[in-house]
């Protein structure tokens, strides 16, 4: 009988890298020893939900069940009467504090809480601060919101039709759902290649939506010290320095008074780069109550209102000669309904994108003040004559 050991080749002993122990070796050259593993395999990791501060309160977010609707009224009387509720914050409250809108990492703004209307299902409407997590969640059911339902845009391919409702009507002069164009390269040279091509091959591609779904959801603890004016944040962020800059803009504090602590992160995959309204709301909650406030989203919130990716309907064209050669010019157009913030990944040629919104999406964006979305369409052609028209399908 042949054993596994007899069948398996013995591992070859590799010669050690002479630069591994050299004092003057370049950074990153040679083997890098991992130091974080022992505490994780022993269950000693310290994640955000393991952080408990003295006197800490807990927050929960009321989200819109509708994709597109006017907010007629918000009655928080019953929620405030709950014995364990310390505060209920609405968009109107934030307007009084000049905190209704927050800048994004894409140099636009997003609504921290909806004020005039909701623009996607799951948009933040109110924030409850209570003594414990369960009381905060229970109090959400005591908030009475009256909505005036509006038509929603659910098909990105129809978002630019003249009969579609305008989602971004907060922007002055906006009469359609065309959010922005992004273009690079030589338009005339690209068009000339296609005009002279012997063959133009077209294809439509549907790329379904994907979500990073990290094991740990997003959350934050904000601790505003009113005596020193210092703000300490414990956050599930992959970009603590960028977050500090945004918080400085939101709260009007100098950056040196803001400390962002990123503890052990239970997965991110890009999902924890953006700055979500829940983060800002913990800061507001701490300012209002004078105590640390923790917010930790549940799984359904994470899937509903944080960054996702893909979800494209793309139309592509490749120009070629009759003998199969592809000239070194290409083009891509990417209309997206979810306001994707990231630039195209092209290295040469002409890249063109148009962005259009669909109401039920959960975007993370440069273009919608109440939205956040995932990543952009990507084309890896280095030197080819292609052009892509891409529309995110549905959300």
Language model features: what each stretch is:
Residues 33, 51-55, 110-112, 117-122, ...:
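Solvent-exposed alpha-helices and their adjacent loops that cap or buttress functional pockets
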Residues 30, 36-39, 103-104, 175-220, ...:
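Glycine-rich loop/linker segments at domain edges
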Residues 15-19, 108, 135-159, 180-185, ...:
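Gly/Pro-rich active-site capping loops and adjacent beta-alpha segments
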């Amino acid at each position: 009988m042949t054993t596994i050991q007899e069948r398996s080749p013995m591992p070859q002993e590799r010669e050690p890298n002479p630069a591994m122990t050299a004092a003057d070796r370049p950074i990153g050259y040679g083997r890098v020893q991992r130091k974080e593993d022992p505490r994780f395999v022993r269950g000693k990791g310290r994640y955000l939900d393991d952080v408990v501060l003295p006197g800490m309160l807990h927050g929960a977010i009321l989200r819109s069940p509708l994709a597109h609707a006017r907010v007629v009224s918000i009655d928080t009387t019953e929620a405030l009467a709950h014995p364990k509720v310390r505060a209920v914050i609405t968009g109107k409250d934030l307007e009084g504090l000049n905190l209704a809108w927050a800048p994004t990492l894409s140099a636009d703004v997003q609504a921290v809480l909806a004020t005039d209307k909701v623009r996607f299902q799951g948009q933040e409407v109110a924030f409850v601060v209570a003594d414990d997590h369960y009381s905060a969640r229970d109090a959400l059911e005591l908030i009475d919101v009256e909505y005036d339902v509006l038509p929603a845009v659910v098909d990105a391919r129809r978002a630019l039709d003249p009969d579609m409702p305008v989602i971004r009507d907060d922007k002055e002069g906006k009469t359609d759902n065309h959010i922005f164009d992004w273009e690079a390269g030589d338009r005339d040279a690209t068009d000339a290649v296609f005009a002279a091509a012997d063959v133009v091959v077209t294809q439509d591609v549907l790329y379904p939506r994907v979500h990073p779904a990290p094991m740990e959801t997003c959350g934050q603890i904000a601790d505003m010290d009113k005596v020193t004016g210092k703000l300490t944040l414990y956050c599930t962020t992959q970009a603590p320095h960028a977050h500090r800059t945004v918080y400085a803009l939101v709260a009007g504090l100098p950056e040196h008074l803001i400390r962002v602590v990123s503890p052990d992160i239970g997965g991110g995959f890009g999902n924890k780069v953006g700055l979500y309204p829940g983060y800002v709301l913990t800061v507001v909650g701490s300012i209002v109550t004078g105590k640390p406030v923790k917010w930790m989203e549940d799984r359904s919130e994470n899937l509903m209102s944080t960054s996702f990716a893909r979800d494209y309907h793309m139309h592509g064209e490749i120009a070629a000669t009759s003998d199969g050669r592809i000239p070194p010019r290409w083009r891509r157009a990417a209309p997206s309904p979810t306001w994707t913030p990231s630039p195209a990944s092209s290295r040469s040629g002409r890249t063109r994108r148009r962005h259009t919104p669909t109401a039920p999406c959960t975007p993370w964006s440069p273009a919608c003040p109440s939205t956040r979305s995932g990543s952009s369409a990507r084309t890896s052609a280095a030197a080819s004559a292609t052009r892509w028209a891409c529309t995110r399908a549905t959300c």
